[in-house]
From Swiss-Prot:
The lineage of its organism: Bacteria, Bacillati, Bacillota, Bacilli, Bacillales. CDD domains: Ribosomal_L1. The gene is rplA. Keywords: Repressor, Ribonucleoprotein, Ribosomal protein, RNA-binding, rRNA-binding, Translation regulation, tRNA-binding. One of its GO terms (cellular component) is large ribosomal subunit. Belongs to the universal ribosomal protein uL1 family. It comes from Oceanobacillus iheyensis (strain DSM 14371 / CIP 107618 / JCM 11309 / KCTC 3954 / HTE831). This is Large ribosomal subunit protein uL1. Pfam families: Ribosomal_L1. Part of the 50S ribosomal subunit. One of its GO terms (molecular function) is tRNA binding.
């Protein structure tokens, strides 16, 4: 059994594990409990009342957080002609066609998100075995397969996050850095929660927003009261 460090033990003492906190208080606690010597990422986790085995309850999408995530995303765009120029003008880090497909096949992954125009997907699709396991495959549901490359790049650079329910009906999404102002983390959490409520499947029965929590990279999980969103 792994030994719990002294700093982590101190952080655990700050949190009542049986209590669900208002989001503002939860953020304050997360900051007090953050003991690492780097700018920890704050992540929100949700347990939803859906059955991921049912096709119409496999929640997946993307959303631009009001205050971004605090992380600069490196964007690779597969496009040609005018769309390639559009991507470059929008600030994409890498733009190309077959040359980048070859680089990826050789183990190059110096990017965080891929955007592809639909006419490039026949070629990009060949990278499925490489990109799929890493969660990097472009997808229309997340706005990364599109001819609107300028908007796609701008959204990603502005702090767009992807969300996807796992097989246990959980969703995990970064909502910022521990260095963010409290209100920015609160705003991001509330906006994300409202977005998840918007995409609630019609076939979902009972309580939809079962529970939620936030945690920093090295900190304890802190339950958040989401009863107002159910």
């Amino acid at each position: 059994m792994a030994k719990i460090g002294k700093k982590h033990q101190e952080a655990l003492k700050l949190v009542d594990r049986s209590k669900s906190y208002e989001i503002k208080e939860a953020v304050e606690l997360a900051k007090k409990a953050a003991k690492a010597n780097f700018d920890e990422t704050v992540e929100a986790a949700f347990r939803l009342g859906v059955d991921p085995k049912k096709a119409d309850q496999q929640i997946r999408g993307a959303f631009v957080l009001p205050h971004g995530t605090g992380k600069t995303q490196r964007v690779l765009v597969f496009a040609k002609g005018e769309k390639a120029k559009e991507a470059e003008a929008a600030g994409a880090d890498y733009v190309g066609e077959g040359d980048y497909i070859n680089k990826i096949n050789q183990g190059w992954f110096e990017f965080d998100v891929i955007v592809a125009t639909p006419d490039m997907m026949a070629e990009v699709g060949k990278l499925g075995r490489v990109l799929g396991p890493k969660g990097l495959m472009p997808n229309p549901k997340t706005g990364t397969v599109t001819f609107e490359v300028e908007k796609a790049v701008n959204d990603i650079k502005a702090g767009k996050v992807e969300y996807r329910v796992d097989k246990s009906a959980n969703i995990h999404v970064p909502i910022g850095k521990i260095s963010f102002d409290d209100q920015k983390l609160v705003d991001n959490f509330v906006a994300l929660t409202e977005q998840l409520v918007k995409v609630k499947p019609q076939s979902s029965k009972g309580i939809y927003m079962k529970n939620a929590s936030i945690t920093s990279t090295m900190g304890p999980g802190i339950k958040v009261d989401v009863s107002n969103f159910r």
